[in-house]
Amino acid sequence: MARSFSLLMVVLVLSYKSICSLGCDLPQTHSLRNRRALILLAQMGRISPFSCLKDRHEFRFPEEEFDGHQFQKTQAISVLHEMIQQTFNLFSTEDSSAAWEQSLLEKFSTELYQQLNDLEACVIQEVGVEETPLMNEDFILAVRKYFQRITLYLMEKKYSPCAWEVVRAEIMRSFSFSTNLKKGLRRKD
């Protein structure tokens, strides 16, 4: 689980690193939205993660798809957009609404939605600049399959509170790690 999670983080960091150097202009609030989403996700925890250790799961992020790959700008934007879109979809379900405190869930969803809008503006600006559609589709498909495994896990566990806690922790680690590394990358520039 740690190795696949590390690879997920590398993908997110590479995506954010590429996005920081894009010709498109993400609003300065984009990083702030990412941090706020992380804080909200942390606040959403209702039960102790220690009580859910038996429910831990290996979601198998597709290492072979991303290992050692240099992302083009458009690919980085698309992968990051897909990751946020899938997270938004996951937390926008009726089952998710039942699992979390409603006001925190709404705020979290709003932050994700605003990040998606920021990234969509970049996608529109970058389309045609460096398009590699087939390779891009492979990355997006890999992300979708990863989130499909998360969804299947939740269904198998009947959307139990512990299953949602495991998923929340998985998503939270990815947000946290990408935020910390983005800060480090900015210091190097």
Curated annotation (Swiss-Prot):
InterPro entries: 4_helix_cytokine-like_core (IPR009079), Interferon_alpha/beta/delta (IPR000471). One of its GO terms (cellular component) is extracellular space. GO terms for biological process: adaptive immune response; B cell activation involved in immune response; cell-cell signaling; cellular response to virus; defense response to virus; humoral immune response; natural killer cell activation involved in immune response; response to exogenous dsRNA. Its main location: secreted. Produced by macrophages, IFN-alpha have antiviral activities. Interferon stimulates the production of two enzymes: a protein kinase and an oligoadenylate synthetase. Belongs to the alpha/beta interferon family. This is Interferon alpha-7. It comes from Homo sapiens (Human). The lineage of its organism: Eukaryota, Metazoa, Chordata, Craniata, Vertebrata. The gene is IFNA7.
